[in-house]
């Protein structure tokens, strides 16, 4: 295979992977916005139950947050060029208030697909207000996010809650390799 065909094939595979990632974010909900919100809420409830079961202390941390974004099905896919997307909900005091979409792009050595649940907790009123006032919030630019990995016997401590914005990621399924 010559270099030109290899690059064209790689680009085609990357485009298909990105298209597949975009097509799987709706979770089977119909085109009806109310049905989509209901599906996102149900998936968020399920993801929160998993978080509470896997990370001791997470329920208390969520309860003390000023607001929380839950992206129950954040799907990543790629082959050299990758992308990720998911729909989520902002919750305040346990109630769904607004609905959001999160996207991500990456370039590098990667191949595969993976689904994750992403939780972003706003621990201060100021951090939440900055998010709500933005028209395209970017982690690291509009706010720094302390990312916590949740694995076996994960425990959330009181030190965790001292950061203004905290993120949790739970793997749902799939395998993603990167370098």
Show the residue positions of the predicted features.
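Bacterial N-terminal signal peptides that target proteins for export
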Residues: 2-11
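Poly-acidic low-complexity segments
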Residues: 1-2, 66
């Amino acid at each position: 295979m010559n270099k030109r065909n290899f690059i064209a094939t790689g680009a085609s595979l990357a485009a298909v992977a990105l298209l597949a990632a975009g097509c799987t974010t709706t979770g089977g909900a119909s085109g009806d916005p109310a049905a989509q919100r209901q599906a996102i809420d149900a998936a968020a409830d399920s993801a929160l139950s998993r978080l509470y079961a896997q990370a001791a202390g997470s329920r208390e941390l969520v309860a003390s947050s000023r607001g929380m974004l839950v992206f129950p099905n954040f799907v990543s896919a790629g082959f050299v060029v990758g992308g990720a997307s998911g729909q989520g909900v902002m919750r305040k005091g346990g109630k769904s208030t607004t609905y959001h979409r999160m996207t991500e792009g990456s370039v590098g050595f990667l191949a595969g697909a993976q689904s994750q649940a992403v939780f972003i907790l706003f621990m201060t009123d100021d951090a939440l207000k900055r998010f709500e006032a933005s028209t395209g919030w970017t982690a690291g630019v509009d706010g720094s996010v302390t990312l916590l990995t949740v694995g076996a016997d994960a425990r959330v401590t009181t030190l965790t809650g001292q950061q203004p914005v905290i993120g949790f990621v739970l793997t749902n399924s799939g395998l993603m390799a990167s370098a």
